[in-house]
Amino acid sequence: MQNEKEGAFKLNNEIVINMEEKVFNGDMLDIGMDNYGVIYNIYKKNNTDFNVEYIDNKKGLDFIKNNSYDICVMFLSFSSIMLKANKQKLVKKICDYLREDGLFYIWDLDKKYGRILNENVKVKISDDITKQIIFKEFNIFKESSYESTKNILNDFFDIIDFKCSDGGYYIKAQKRRRSEYEKIENIISGDKF
């Protein structure tokens, strides 16, 4: 996976995420529990006139209008959400926030039940900018594996690109057209057909 531009690979006991060639265009929603500054720096590097909305807690989501963003990014933050039901609710909200054909990007670490994580993550943003992150998750009941994340996204998004290796994963998904997921939305919200 070392030649993959957006994937993760292990090098000297570090998970390395290469984002040197990543470009985001359009209005972006950056959802994260910790502000690592990675996504903002990449976005700023490639856009002179830009709109990035950063949300770092659940309350911030209440003020977002539907169909407002072209892109949503979660960088090392999807795994911080406890319970599959909460992840499903968030993904549904993100789907609503995105414009038609909007893109949802996730970079995270592959954590299964019963495991703890204490990883050094090196993010290569450009030739001269590298970010070091220490990622710790000691809750053995939290699960945020690539497979479970992909399954949660499948209800509202089409996965158009993914990479999973050496403890990390990347998913790029595109919002489905509303008619394709209205039934799922009704089931989640408790409405009957």
Feature-to-residue mapping (PLM):
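C-terminal alpha-helical "lid/dimerization" subdomain adjacent to the S-adenosyl-L-methionine
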Residues: 109-156
